């Protein structure tokens, strides 16, 4: 075999090996995804609603309808600040969470005005069983979900809010409870795909329809907003390296689908 043929043969086999590794990597990446919502029932999920004990799904707030996980208030009278969260049963540390959502036209008028077309995904949260009956918000970080409130007025989705927590944004702890993303504004009945990428207590990325719209770092316990919590849980300055994921209910109807996660 000539030298040139040897080089070509070696290059060809190297190319095949690279293709093989790429294919293997793609398959492995796909196999890493775990579905969190089975489309049939709330297996693996635990509700915690303000004024109620952990595990009490008051008035069937969280339900499955036509394969979608729905936040619904059909069986409510007055809202009475029943801010709720549906927790997945397992905590996560470094992960990519992916889901799709859209709002419904249901909103309880006695809920706070800011809850209109507003929901969220909490992460790095305290465990649901540690949330006191009269504690309003879990100590956690929130990927806030918004839709248009007034036509033509920007209201980006994918923001960050911080009940009982702090984050570092643009090099310093940001004193604001919520930090706006660069995402567009969506109509309330549009399906939107969102992704949350978290590396323990280091970097957090918010993605909307595949675009990174917000990045911040060093999530930690601190700040205000959460009330009537167990002081033993809220130790300010504690890095949030892991925690629970939860879907929010705060007076606005919303539906979720294709909720899945992979650990990083």
Model features per residue range: what roles?
Residues 1-29:
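Bacterial Sec-dependent N-terminal signal peptides
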Residues 23-264:
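Carbohydrate-interacting regions of secretory-pathway proteins
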């Amino acid at each position: 075999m000539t030298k040139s043929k040897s080089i070509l043969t070696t290059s060809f086999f190297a190319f095949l090996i690279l293709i093989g590794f790429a294919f293997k990597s793609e398959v492995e990446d796909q196999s890493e995804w775990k579905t969190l919502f089975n489309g049939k029932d709330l297996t693996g999920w635990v509700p915690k609603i303000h004024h109620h004990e952990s595990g009490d799904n008051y008035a069937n707030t969280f339900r499955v309808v036509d394969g979608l996980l729905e936040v619904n208030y059909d069986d409510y009278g007055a809202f009475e600040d029943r801010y709720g969260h549906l927790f997945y049963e397992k905590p996560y540390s470094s992960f990519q969470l992916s889901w799709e959502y859209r709002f419904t036209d249901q909103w309880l008028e006695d809920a706070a005005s800011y809850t209109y077309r507003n929901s969220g995904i909490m992460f790095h949260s305290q465990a649901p069983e540690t949330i006191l009956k009269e504690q309003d918000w879990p100590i956690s970080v929130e990927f806030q979900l918004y839709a248009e409130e007034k036509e033509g007025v920007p209201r980006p989705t994918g923001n960050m809010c911080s009940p009982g927590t702090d984050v570092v944004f643009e090099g310093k702890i940001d004193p604001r409870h919520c930090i706006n993303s660069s995402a567009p504004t969506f109509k309330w009945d549009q399906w939107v795909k969102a992704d949350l990428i978290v590396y323990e207590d280091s970097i957090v990325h918010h993605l909307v329809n595949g675009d990174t719209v917000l990045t911040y770092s060093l999530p930690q316990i601190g700040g205000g907003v959460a009330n009537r919590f167990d002081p033993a849980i809220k130790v300010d300055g504690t890095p949030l390296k892991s925690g629970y994921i939860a879907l929010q209910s705060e007076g606005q109807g919303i539906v979720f689908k294709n909720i899945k996660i992979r650990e990083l």
